[in-house]
Amino acid sequence: MSPAGKGPAWRQPAILAAAGAAHALSFAPDPLPAWSLAPVQVIALAVAAHASLQAPSARRALARGWLFAMFSFSLGLYWLYVSMHDYGGLAAPLAAAGVLALSAFLALFPGLACAAARWLCPPHWDASPPARARRTLYTAATWAACWAALEWLRAVVLTGFPWLNIGYAHVDSPLAGWAPLLGVHGMALLAAFAAAALAGLWQSASGRIDSRQALAAGVALLLAGAGWLLGQFSWSRPEGKPLHLRLVQGNVEQSQKFDPALLETGLRRHLELASLPPRPGEPKPDLIILPETVLPVFQDQLPASVWDAWIEVARRADTRIAMGVPLHTQPDGATGHRYTNSVIGFDASTPVEQLRTGTTAMRYDKQHLVPWGEYVPPGFRWFVDMLDIPLGDFDRGAARQPSFDIAGQRIAFNICYEDLFGPGLLPALQDGPDGRPGATIMANVSNLGWFGNTWALRQHLQIGRLRTMETARPMVAATNTGITAAIDARGRVAAALPAGRAGVLPVAVQGMTGLTPYARFGDKPALALIGLLLIAAPALG
């Protein structure tokens, strides 16, 4: 019998709840230091692995995995309360209930993973020592494959919400070396294997560590070592000269951003920041990037004088400007209207009429829209109306859109949480069917002001770092309230502005070319490995 079954009835739920809360701390260095995130994640998840694998039934394993994940998601996503209550105007009990309801739904995926692993790998404590050692390896592989498979499902079901995928806890661990090959889901597989291997070291029948069960842990260490070696390899090469960018962080308070009475104040702040002269010795920017919805109304609702002012900024600085703006357009030959969350690019020669009609040559329309925030799922109009979300029903952008050609570099934009979905970024990095080369730099524009100065900002930066590791492309992030940053092609933060402050970040970004295996094949290799383990490991064990 497992020690998990001994002691008072409340002990195991309390341990799982505490482990789940600790697990939430492993995503982004706040409040824990960066070096501790990966060990905390593996140790906390090992508690869930041990408890679920020693459950008396698959149903009990589901309950244990769900409880662990419920506490992990509830704490890790607490910042959703801020958006719903502080800025959405939802009553505190309803906002808290919203966070708990979402966490309960998301926790079903880990719960089902634990149930599947328990069903495929029943406890084997009564087996002979050699058989127990062999089965520990296969059990760890099966449990990891189940967990990673459900992480992937969480990324695609109902448009997907893969925030807090366990792979993100390892951006500073040796497992990050696997990112260019297997992506975040492959890293999740390896992290889950390490946790299950750690759980397998504990021989519950005697309460002592059994060295004969260390095989899986040894394999986990070998995989970490291989990841470190892979991390020394350069998967891309420089192209052209570094691009000089100015990233603008306006820090407009979310409660004021969509207030019509304060529209001019926000516009003036961004104009002033964009117009700042370069510091002594600092080259002029090739491009000024401003955040998502820096103009909080549709472009055709602004007078021509506003666009004249922006064109004047571009003229004085002798540069181009890219900004996030909601667009209202009527495509040629179409009878309907189109509303998109977009990024537009322009310079001093761009006619004002193009800006007012949304027909600029450089334009990106957001593809992966936020449910309830940017589009209304069927039957949920009442919820969106209750939150009073502005600009809440957009059309989707095309799957592949042209990059912005700036001074010999090609920039692929994404908006808000689109960088959470790695496969969606890949078409822009690959050569097009027309022979057009892929992008050399990625750029994210966001407005995270909805979440205050919370963990969401650090978690989002962590997500961006992993995207650069997967693709070996640098990424810059221009955000309203933070964290505005430049990340190099190895996932290192080269420069960043403090959250919650207005300012500009001048950076030189070296564009890169060449495709990593992940950039070429996406999640397919990781999914193939997960599928192979799900078929082979239980049979061999």
Curated annotation (Swiss-Prot):
Q: Name one GO molecular function term.
A: N-acyltransferase activity
User: What keywords would UniProt list here?
Assistant: Acyltransferase, Cell inner membrane, Cell membrane, Membrane, Transferase, Transmembrane, Transmembrane helix
Which parts of the chain span the membrane according to its record? 31-51, 65-85, 89-109, 144-164, 181-201, 215-235
Top-rank EC class of the record's enzyme:
transferase
Q: Where located?
A: Cell inner membrane
Primary role: Catalyzes the phospholipid dependent N-acylation of the N-terminal cysteine of apolipoprotein, the last step in lipoprotein maturation.
What's the name of the protein? Putative apolipoprotein N-acyltransferase
Q: Which gene encodes it?
A: lnt
